[in-house]
């Protein structure tokens, strides 16, 4: 024990390092994945059910393909509305900021 630390202190230091590494990993993983809306989760569940039915032989490949395409079309409609709504809200926020800076 040249460092002057007891083995307990060394263990605590190691645990602190492990905890900080875990936090970094959690933060990194949270940044990598986009937030999912309820509609996104519902789409994932529908697609999972289609795969399950296909693998169990309850539906044909053609039927599964049609269902996936229908789900995708519905998703595209929702996604385009969401993007349009986001763009409109950003424009409103920018104009409000400009008005405040002109007044101030």
From Swiss-Prot:
<dbReference type="GO" id="GO:0016779">
    <property type="term" value="F:nucleotidyltransferase activity"/>
</dbReference>
<dbReference type="InterPro" id="IPR021985">
    <property type="entry name" value="RNA_pol_Rpo13"/>
</dbReference>
<dbReference type="GO" id="GO:0070063">
    <property type="term" value="F:RNA polymerase binding"/>
</dbReference>
<comment type="subunit">
    <text>Part of the 13-subunit RNA polymerase complex. Rpo1N and Rpo5 form a cleft which docks Rpo13. Forms predominantly dimers in solution, although monomers and trimers can also be seen. Found associated with RNAP but also as a homodimer pool in the cytoplasm in vivo.</text>
</comment>
<dbReference type="GO" id="GO:0005737">
    <property type="term" value="C:cytoplasm"/>
</dbReference>
<dbReference type="GO" id="GO:0003677">
    <property type="term" value="F:DNA binding"/>
</dbReference>
<keyword id="KW-0804">Transcription</keyword>
<feature type="region of interest" description="Disordered">
    <location>
        <begin position="1"/>
        <end position="34"/>
    </location>
</feature>
<keyword id="KW-0963">Cytoplasm</keyword>
<keyword id="KW-0240">DNA-directed RNA polymerase</keyword>
<keyword id="KW-0238">DNA-binding</keyword>
<feature type="compositionally biased region" description="Acidic residues">
    <location>
        <begin position="7"/>
        <end position="31"/>
    </location>
</feature>
<keyword id="KW-0548">Nucleotidyltransferase</keyword>
<feature type="binding site">
    <location>
        <position position="32"/>
    </location>
    <ligand>
        <name>DNA</name>
    </ligand>
</feature>
<comment type="similarity">
    <text>Belongs to the archaeal Rpo13 RNA polymerase subunit family.</text>
</comment>
<dbReference type="Pfam" id="PF12136">
    <property type="entry name" value="RNA_pol_Rpo13"/>
</dbReference>
<comment type="function">
    <text>DNA-dependent RNA polymerase (RNAP) catalyzes the transcription of DNA into RNA using the four ribonucleoside triphosphates as substrates. A molten-globule protein, it binds dsDNA in the RNAP, in vitro binds dsDNA but not ssDNA. Its position in RNAP implies it functions in both transcription initiation and elongation.</text>
</comment>
<feature type="region of interest" description="Disordered">
    <location>
        <begin position="76"/>
        <end position="104"/>
    </location>
</feature>
<dbReference type="GO" id="GO:0000428">
    <property type="term" value="C:DNA-directed RNA polymerase complex"/>
</dbReference>
<keyword id="KW-0808">Transferase</keyword>
<feature type="compositionally biased region" description="Basic residues">
    <location>
        <begin position="80"/>
        <end position="104"/>
    </location>
</feature>
<feature type="region of interest" description="Required to bind DNA">
    <location>
        <begin position="81"/>
        <end position="104"/>
    </location>
</feature>
<protein>
    <recommendedName>
        <fullName>DNA-directed RNA polymerase subunit Rpo13</fullName>
        <ecNumber>2.7.7.6</ecNumber>
    </recommendedName>
</protein>
